[in-house]
């Protein structure tokens, strides 16, 4: 008979990635059925209570306290809780090269520090970022849930000091060939990028690399920078820097649509920029710029890459390895193999920008989709756990990541959702993104290969043909090996494309075919 | 005292607070990165800090 136990440690902080690894190792112990290791935030405690855990230790745990919850054989649980410290010890190799006890201690060891990389919980992030700026460092602020007034204060302070705050909610930067955060191994080249979206910058830089060109600098700004509340403070700083940078020949700007007045500010700034520029404001209605722009405005990341390459005058090869020219024929072939009633796409995305961009591809063909992050004109998916018709889900959004790592690191939620979608006889095609590079999962394709092949098999046994379409954002230099990742997906039965736009266009063709067949 | 320009010219010389993986990835790219063993301020300190922030 199984039992439940909860152990806590007061004022012991561990990050969610480390705790995920602890929970995974615990759950592999003989006799342990369920294991969770989280900080005792209200949201995490609610998840544990919903899982059936209870008791005084859990009730008293606060956000600064560690909570380990276990279900299974009584002896197994006792063995873990009596030796909890051993389970919480970090491998010594992780700390090779020195660890400081504070920002001041770190600065005393490395006085030339020029960048603070901050990923602490959001409520503490602004204070740490202010301290870094006060010490004369630029800031890469990965943390989210930072108040917008804190963001504005930080960015104003940075402007006054000739520094930049990349973030909050900044996933990626490329600083002269070095990736910060979630970044790919990309060669240096003539194209400089300013990006409000981490995955947008990753996709753009990978496609530039795969076209034999390169990136001078990719400066993140955080997802809210071009809102009217923030006014593009970091974007303007980054444009100034890239305009002065001798290595940069072309400047690309990637973002969701800016606020109205910020769009005017950015348009005016790019119009007087001495270097050619390309803007991709995903989801922007075309006439919002009123013909004012004296720079290229592109609807998709792929179009922006093509424009930037052309403006840079590079002799770039076309983005390789996609059966694009045969795409429509292949889509028709896939659609013809499907059973009556198979009509819809279910897109399960690790990258929020990909969820957004796929909706844009669908909107152009007047295909209505439901999403937890809907583009203008699309429908809001009230319960993100339950798909309706065509559904595209950003699985990196808050409702999926409270208490668990991002799907770029941990594929378990996507694996479960793939299985659920495969059981739905109305589903024609699954659309998935795979993001390689530093700090992503060591094997993103391998993490979901079984889920993909099982989904296809379940559908097949029910007399259906389920298409699985994937895009892989990565380069040949990435630690995960792009070619191997693509092959793993093909072996699992997926059709693989080199970009999200190409995969989305293929899926759109299938959906249109199925709508035609089923009337 | 760094600037954005010096970051771009010298490359990242980083101090990392939070996910240790970010420091490890920089070191994998042969860039200096010191990881800070960060933990949240105790709740009492937090309240006091908020009061000080208000006053200052």
Question: Model features per residue range: what roles?
Answer:
Chain A
Residues 2-519:
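Catalytic-core regions of core metabolic enzymes
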């Amino acid at each position: 008979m199984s039992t439940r136990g909860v152990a806590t440690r007061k004022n012991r902080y561990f990050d969610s990635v480390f705790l995920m690894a602890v929970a995974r190792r615990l759950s592999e112990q003989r006799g342990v059925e369920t294991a969770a290791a989280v900080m005792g935030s209200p949201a995490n405690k609610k998840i544990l209570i919903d899982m059936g855990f209870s008791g005084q230790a859990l009730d008293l745990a606060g956000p600064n306290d560690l909570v380990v919850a276990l279900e299974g054989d009584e002896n197994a649980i006792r063995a873990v809780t009596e030796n909890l410290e051993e389970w919480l010890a970090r491998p010594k190799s992780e700390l090779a090269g020195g660890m400081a006890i504070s920002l001041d201690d770190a600065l005393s060891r490395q006085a030339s520090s020029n960048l603070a990389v901050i990923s602490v919980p959001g409520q503490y992030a602004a204070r740490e970022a202010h301290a870094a700026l006060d010490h004369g460092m630029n800031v890469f602020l990965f943390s989210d849930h930072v108040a917008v007034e804190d963001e504005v204060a930080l960015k104003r302070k940075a402007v006054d000091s000739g520094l930049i705050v990349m973030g909050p909610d900044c996933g990626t930067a490329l600083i002269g060939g070095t990736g910060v955060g979630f970044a790919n191994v990309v060669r240096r080249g003539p194209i400089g990028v300013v990006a409000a979206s981490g995955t947008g910058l990753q996709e753009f830089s990978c496609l530039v690399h795969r076209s034999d060109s390169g990136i001078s600098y990719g400066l993140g700004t955080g997802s809210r920078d071009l809102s009217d509340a923030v006014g593009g403070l970091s974007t303007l700083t980054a444009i100034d820097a890239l305009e002065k940078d001798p290595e940069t020949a072309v400047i690309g700007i990637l973002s969701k649509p800016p606020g109205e007045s910020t769009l005017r500010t950015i348009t005016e700034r790019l119009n007087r920029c001495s270097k050619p520029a390309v803007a991709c404001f995903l989801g922007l209605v075309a006439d919002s710029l009123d013909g004012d722009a004296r720079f290229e405005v592109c609807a998709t990341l792929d179009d922006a890459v093509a424009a930037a390459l052309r403006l840079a005058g590079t002799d770039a090869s076309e983005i390789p390895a996609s059966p694009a020219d045969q795409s429509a024929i292949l889509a028709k072939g896939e659609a013809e193999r499907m059973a009556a009633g198979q009509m819809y796409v279910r897109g399960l995305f690790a990258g929020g920008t990909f969820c957004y961009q796929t909706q844009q591809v669908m909107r152009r063909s007047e295909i209505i989709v439901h999403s937890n992050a809907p583009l203008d004109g699309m429908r809001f998916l009230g319960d993100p756990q339950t798909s309706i018709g065509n559904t595209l889900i950003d699985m990196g959004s808050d409702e999926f990541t409270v208490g668990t790592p991002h799907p770029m690191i941990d594929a378990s939620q996507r694996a479960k959702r793939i299985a659920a979608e495969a059981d739905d006889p109305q589903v024609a095609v699954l659309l998935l993104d795979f993001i390689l590079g530093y700090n992503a999962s060591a094997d993103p394709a391998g993490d979901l290969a079984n889920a993909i092949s099982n989904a296809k098999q379940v559908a097949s046994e029910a007399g259906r043909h389920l298409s699985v379409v994937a895009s892989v954002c990565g380069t040949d230099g990435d630690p995960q090996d792009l070619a191997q990742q693509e092959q793993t997906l093909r072996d699992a039965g997926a059709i693989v494309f080199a970009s999200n736009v190409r995969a989305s266009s293929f899926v759109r063709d299938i959906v249109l075919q199925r709508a035609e067949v089923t009337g | 005292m760094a600037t954005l320009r010096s970051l771009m010219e010298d490359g990242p010389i980083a101090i990392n607070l939070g996910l240790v993986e970010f420091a490890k990835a920089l070191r994998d790219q042969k860039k200096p990165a010191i990881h800070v063993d960060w933990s949240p301020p105790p709740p009492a300190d937090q309240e006091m800090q908020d009061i000080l922030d208000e006053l200052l």
